[in-house]
Amino acid sequence: MAKTVLGIHVTFLTLLFAVILLNDVMYTPVEKICERASGTWKGICIHSNDCNNQCVKWENAGSGSCHYQFPNYMCFCYFNC
């Protein structure tokens, strides 16, 4: 009888612990990414790797990429909002 009660308690505590862990993982907020034109890039953006390097090194952005915005391709940097 004592082993059965102990087993039920262990099972209950294990399930409770799993629910708490999964709840924390499932509701982790996702950071929003903000985009803005590079303030240091000059001219038409042709190579996204160059844009990315400049955004990361000079503007402390997470990344950068070339995108078309009228009238030409521009370098855009991406930051955590």
From Swiss-Prot:
Gene3D superfamilies: Knottin, scorpion toxin-like
GO biological process entries: defense response to fungus; killing of cells of another organism
One Pfam family, short name: Gamma-thionin
SMART domains named among the record's database cross-references: Knot1
Signal peptide from the UniProt entry: 1-31
Disulfide bonds: 34-81, 45-66, 51-75, 55-77
InterPro entries, sorted: Defensin_plant, Scorpion_toxin-like, Scorpion_toxin-like_sf
Annotated SUPFAM superfamilies: Scorpion toxin-like
The keyword Disulfide bond is annotated on this UniProt entry: yes
Record keywords: Antimicrobial, Disulfide bond, Fungicide, Signal
Role, per record: Antimicrobial peptide probably active against fungi like B.sorokiniana, F.oxysporum, F.graminearum, F.avenaceum, B.cinerea, P.beta, P.infestans and P.debaryanum.
Family according to the record: Belongs to the DEFL family.
Protein name per the record: Antimicrobial peptide D2
Organism annotation: Stellaria media
